[in-house]
Structure formats: structure tokens, C-alpha cells
Design a protein with these regions (language model features):
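Ligand-binding pockets and gating/stacking loops
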Residues: 1-169
């Protein structure tokens, strides 16, 4: 068991949500003490806090004291879509009200960030995210494309035609 730490002073949050991504046994929760049929085919690496991550996360294990891994998240929904909505908003889905996502809630609570977007969604806002009743001031800046593509450009950040970098700078 990892030792207890002091309350955090974090000013930023990186929420990694991988719908259809790697299984928890092959990433953050390898279940290394379980029988082979439950723990998966990969080995583990000990983190700098004493926990274990998959061997695929060796570099992340070195900075585990700087992150929070939530292994106890559950919901009572039968469908993945409804469960995802519940996890990303904290509320069960309702046709009557569109609730804000975690990014919008955090940006609302932290307030403005010196002309920076409230939060960034890569590559785009999920179906279960959005500002809900908080309004567009708390919405994500969506890249709108996959940064892994060779021709990737962040939309709306190009200079207007006829303006070159020399004139702009």
C-alpha cells in the first residue's frame, strides 16, 4: 500500500480518458497478485510511491508521486454511454438537463486563466463533455484534429492570408 501524502496544491488537471483504450490490467491496475487469467500478459514495474503499473508505463512509474490514479470508479449504469456520461459529469443522464463536464466544472471553479482557454480537448470534445448550463465561457478549446497526423494544424491559430510572420511579429 502506498504511503499517505499531504493535500495537493495542484493548479492543473490532465484528465486522461481512453474510451475503448487499453485494459486496466495492462495499464494502471495490473492486478499482479491475481491468477494469470485475470492479470493479463504483461509484467509490472514498481512506482516511486510503491504501487505497481504495467511494464508499458515505466516512465510514468517514475513520476507516480505527481499523479493521481483512481482505481475505485464505478457507476450503476448498464450501458457504457450512460456510464461515461455519469463519470464525466457526476450526474446520471437526463433528457431534461444537459450537465457540464468535468472540464467545464473545473474551469468554473478555478476561474479565468490569463487569456488561456478554460481547458483543451484533444482531438475534440467528447459527446459526454460540454458546458451544459454553465455557458460557453467554460467550454473547451478543441484542436479539431489528431496531432499525430503529419499535416496537423491547430484550427483558428493560423495567420490570416496576406499577413506573414514578419509583419505579425
Amino acid at each position: 500500500m502506498a504511503k499517505q501524502s499531504k493535500p495537493g496544491k495542484a493548479k492543473n488537471i490532465i484528465n486522461i480518458f481512453l474510451p475503448g483504450g487499453s485494459a486496466h490490467q495492462e495499464s494502471w491496475d495490473p492486478k499482479y497478485l491475481s491468477p494469470a487469467e485475470y492479470r493479463g500478459p504483461l509484467g509490472t514495474v514498481k512506482t516511486n510511491t510503491g504501487e505497481r503499473f504495467s511494464e508499458n508505463l515505466k516512465n510514468t512509474a517514475k513520476v507516480a508521486d505527481k499523479i493521481t490514479v483512481i482505481r475505485s470508479m464505478t457507476h450503476g449504469e448498464a450501458a457504457h454511454e450512460r456510464g461515461t456520461h455519469n463519470m464525466m459529469t457526476g450526474i446520471r443522464p437526463s433528457p431534461a438537463v444537459i450537465f457540464p463536464s468535468i472540464g467545464s466544472i473545473v474551469s468554473h471553479e478555478f476561474g479565468p486563466r490569463k487569456n488561456l482557454p478554460p481547458y483543451v480537448a484533444i482531438p475534440s470534445q467528447s459527446r459526454n463533455g460540454g458546458t451544459g448550463y454553465l455557458g460557453s465561457a467554460y467550454g473547451a478549446f478543441s484542436l479539431g484534429a489528431d496531432p499525430g497526423n503529419s499535416n496537423f494544424r491547430v484550427r483558428d491559430l493560423a495567420l490570416p492570408s496576406g499577413i506573414d510572420a514578419k509583419r505579425f511579429g
